[in-house]
């Protein structure tokens, strides 16, 4: 039996359990414009199939064609999935969002207090279809795990990585590289404009004026 909801609990009270990655799929669903929705499907029983991959690379959610209770699990929002790093929940600070850049989708873990997002999964976008989904492939080191509370399995999956958050941020920052402003180097002070005096101009000022003295020679 999977527990579905729990009150807010300390991040250290949950454990996790490895899952068979072949029985899960991470999907992106087009919801309008360049916006995408993240969902995870899990195959509990072998048949019928909860999803099928189409020849064009998109994924059909076949679980919509039958009563999938006890056969498939769906994880549709932050109640069903979150981020786990180095054995700790970090859902209190990170949010999972799908970003589109031209023909590429990336699942990002975003923390408003940090400027560099962590890439969790990605995919090349074959095409956009409202009734079919795009499969996202987890980046190296990332796996889906089950949330465990006092030995009981919960209806919640983790996007989990063994490295701590600070190391993941450092790797993401190194991969992103220096910004264009940093590559330009420190700005230099502008040179002062050249001083030019017109032939018939008069110089006004205080104090003596040094004059060029030419010695007289008879």
Predicted segments, located by residue:
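Extracellular/luminal recognition modules and glycoprotein regions
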Residues: 9-63, 128, 138-177, 185
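Low-complexity intrinsically disordered segments
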Residues: 83-217
């Amino acid at each position: 039996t999977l527990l579905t909801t729990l009150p807010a609990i300390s991040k250290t009270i949950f454990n996790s359990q490895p899952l068979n990655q072949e029985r899960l799929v991470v999907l992106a669903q087009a919801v309008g414009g360049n916006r995408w929705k993240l969902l995870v499907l899990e195959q509990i029983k072998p048949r019928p199939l909860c999803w099928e991959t189409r020849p064009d690379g998109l994924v059909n959610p076949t679980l919509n064609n039958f009563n999938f209770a006890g056969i498939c699990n769906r994880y549709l929002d932050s109640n069903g999935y979150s981020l786990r790093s180095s054995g700790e929940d970090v859902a209190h600070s990170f949010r999972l969002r799908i970003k589109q850049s031209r023909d590429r989708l990336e699942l990002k873990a975003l923390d408003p207090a940090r400027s560099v997002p962590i890439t969790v999964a990605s995919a090349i976008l074959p095409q956009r279809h409202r009734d079919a989904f795009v499969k996202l492939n987890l980046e190296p080191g990332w796996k889906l795990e089950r949330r465990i509370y006092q030995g009981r399995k919960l209806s919640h999956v983790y996007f989990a990585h063994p490295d701590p958050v600070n190391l993941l941020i450092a790797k993401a920052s190194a991969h992103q590289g220096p910004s264009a402003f940093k590559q330009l180097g420190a700005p230099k002070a502008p040179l002062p404009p050249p001083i030019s005096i017109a032939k018939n101009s008069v110089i006004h000022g205080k104090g003596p004026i040094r004059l060029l003295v030419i010695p007289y020679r008879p």
